[in-house]
């Protein structure tokens, strides 16, 4: 590339300034003589530090170019994977596509949980900043903040109508919110340590919670009384989730096990122990996934009767496991994440599993073939939570980078 006379003169003056300001006197005087520079103090102020500025801006631009190239490659891949035909793709096969539709800021600490509202076009996020925030996922607008907890909010859960929201916190309480008036209508005390997980039961009459005090408790929504305590885990209980009809609850713990409990009798129906580290998260597979699961695993479970139920678990051992609860067996292990798995769920269409992890990615698994079919660099930091909308083509993720991201699926 040939420089014009003016550009050459500017470059020479910038080099001369660099040599002089860094004390290379001999090189400076030789260069000045050879480049035939007439150094003028006023004129030279313009070139002070210019070489370093240009150098750093070149590096910055190079980084930007690389980022844009990778986005371009991603976009090309999207097109070859069925850009124009995407319209014809069956909604059961919709998966999140980069880049995100919205990156929402507002929390002042890591985001711990994100969930969609079952009816309205809003989603809710919980954070270590002790707040719960409500956002419109279609417009990306922030709607309101629910304040009441005095420490990190660890988990949130809607009832099936979306009129009630339950939250739990490191402040050792569980709160029930009227999601129409956005007021806290009840605070439940009873755990002796950080309450790490909460879920409203499918019938809407009870709430289950899990705590660092090693117990799981069941609470009556109408009164706020604790009506049952499930004991058995030997360490911090990380998460609790009821199955679809509310007859079973699953829990996972720092003791590296997953347990399944019969709600009516409080007995532990299964203790699933194959993970090699803390089990961070669990998720029940919906019935829509049962045919694919049976096909993928050739599971022997109740060939005559109803299959399953099936449960997913994600661990700090970086794996996701699928279990047939009726026989207490691990059906498959998905390996691919490079760090702790923090969340996973079965795609509403039943064919895929989505997961997020501390490797900052969101992954889509074709579990029938036990392979990761897509990896999205989702956040700048650990991805702590994800949710897939049951009817609309959206996925939401939350992260330690304090943002909530909305991903469109197609």
Swiss-Prot record:
Residues 7-39 form the LisH domain. InterPro entries: Dynein_regulator_LIS1, G-protein_beta_WD-40_rep, LIS1_N, LisH, PAC1-like_LisH-like_dom, WD40/YVTN_repeat-like_dom_sf, WD40_repeat_CS, WD40_repeat_dom_sf. Residues 56-82 form a coiled coil. Its main location: cytoplasm. GO terms for biological process: cell differentiation; cell division; establishment of mitotic spindle orientation; microtubule sliding; nervous system development; reelin-mediated signaling pathway. Pfam families: LisH_PAC1, WD40. It comes from the Eukaryota. Signal peptide: none annotated. Keywords: Cell cycle, Cell division, Coiled coil, Cytoplasm, Cytoskeleton, Developmental protein, Differentiation, Microtubule, Mitosis, Neurogenesis, Repeat, Transport, WD repeat. WD repeats lie at residues 106-147, 148-187, 190-229, 232-271, 274-333, 336-375, 378-410. Can self-associate. Component of the cytosolic PAF-AH (I) heterotetrameric enzyme, which is composed of PAFAH1B1 (beta), PAFAH1B2 (alpha2) and PAFAH1B3 (alpha1) subunits. The catalytic activity of the enzyme resides in the alpha1 (PAFAH1B3) and alpha2 (PAFAH1B2) subunits, whereas the beta subunit (PAFAH1B1) has regulatory activity. Trimer formation is not essential for the catalytic activity. Interacts with dynein, dynactin, nde1 and ndel1. Regulatory subunit (beta subunit) of the cytosolic type I platelet-activating factor (PAF) acetylhydrolase (PAF-AH (I)), an enzyme that catalyzes the hydrolyze of the acetyl group at the sn-2 position of PAF and its analogs and participates in PAF inactivation. Regulates the PAF-AH (I) activity in a catalytic dimer composition-dependent manner. Positively regulates the activity of the minus-end directed microtubule motor protein dynein. May enhance dynein-mediated microtubule sliding by targeting dynein to the microtubule plus end. Dimerization mediated by the LisH domain may be required to activate dynein. PANTHER family: WD REPEAT-CONTAINING PROTEIN POP1. Belongs to the WD repeat LIS1/nudF family. This is Lissencephaly-1 homolog A. It comes from Salmo salar. The lineage of its organism: Eukaryota, Metazoa, Chordata, Craniata, Vertebrata. The gene is pafah1b1-1.
């Amino acid at each position: 590339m040939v420089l014009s006379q003016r550009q050459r003169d500017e470059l020479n003056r910038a080099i001369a300034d660099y040599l002089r300001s860094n004390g290379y006197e001999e090189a400076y005087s030789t260069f000045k003589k050879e480049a035939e520079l007439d150094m003028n103090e006023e004129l030279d102020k313009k070139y002070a530090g210019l070489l370093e500025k240009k150098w750093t801006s070149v590096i910055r631009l190079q980084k930007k170019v690389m980022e844009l190239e990778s986005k371009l490659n991603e976009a090309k891949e999207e097109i070859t994977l069925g850009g124009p035909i995407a319209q014809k793709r069956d909604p059961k096969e919709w998966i999140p596509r980069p880049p995100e539709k919205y990156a929402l800021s507002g929390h002042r600490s890591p985001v711990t949980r994100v969930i969609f509202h079952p009816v309205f076009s809003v989603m809710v996020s919980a954070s270590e900043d002790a707040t719960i925030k409500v956002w419109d996922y279609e417009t990306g607008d922030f709607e309101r903040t629910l304040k009441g907890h005095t420490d990190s909010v660890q988990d949130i859960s809607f009832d099936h109508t979306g009129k009630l929201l339950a939250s739990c916190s490191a402040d050792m309480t569980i709160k029930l919110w009227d999601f129409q008036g956005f007021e806290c209508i009840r605070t439940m005390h009873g755990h002796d340590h950080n309450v790490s997980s909460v879920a409203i039961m499918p019938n809407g009459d009870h709430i289950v919670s899990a705590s660092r005090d090693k117990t799981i408790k069941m609470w009556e929504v109408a009164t706020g009384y604790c009506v049952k305590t499930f004991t058995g885990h030997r360490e911090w209980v990380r998460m609790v989730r009821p199955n679809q009809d509310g007859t079973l609850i699953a829990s996972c713990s720092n003791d590296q096990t997953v347990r399944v409990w019969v709600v009516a009798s409080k007995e532990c129906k299964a203790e699933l122990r194959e993970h090699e580290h803390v089990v961070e998260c669990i998720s029940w597979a919906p019935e829509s996934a049962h045919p694919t699961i049976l096909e993928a695993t050739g599971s022997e479970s109740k060939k005559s009767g109803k299959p399953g139920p099936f449960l997913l678990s994600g661990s700090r051992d970086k794996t996701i496991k699928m279990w047939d609860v009726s026989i207490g067996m691990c059906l498959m292990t998905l390996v691919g994440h490079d760090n702790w798995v923090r969340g996973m769920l079965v795609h509403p269409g039943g064919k895929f599993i989505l997961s997020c992890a501390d490797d900052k990615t969101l992954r889509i698994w074709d579990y029938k073939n036990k392979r990761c079919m897509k990896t999205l660099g989702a956040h700048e930091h650990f991805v702590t939570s994800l949710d897939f909308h049951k009817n609309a083509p959206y996925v939401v993720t939350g992260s330690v980078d304090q943002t909530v991201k909305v991903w469109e699926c197609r």
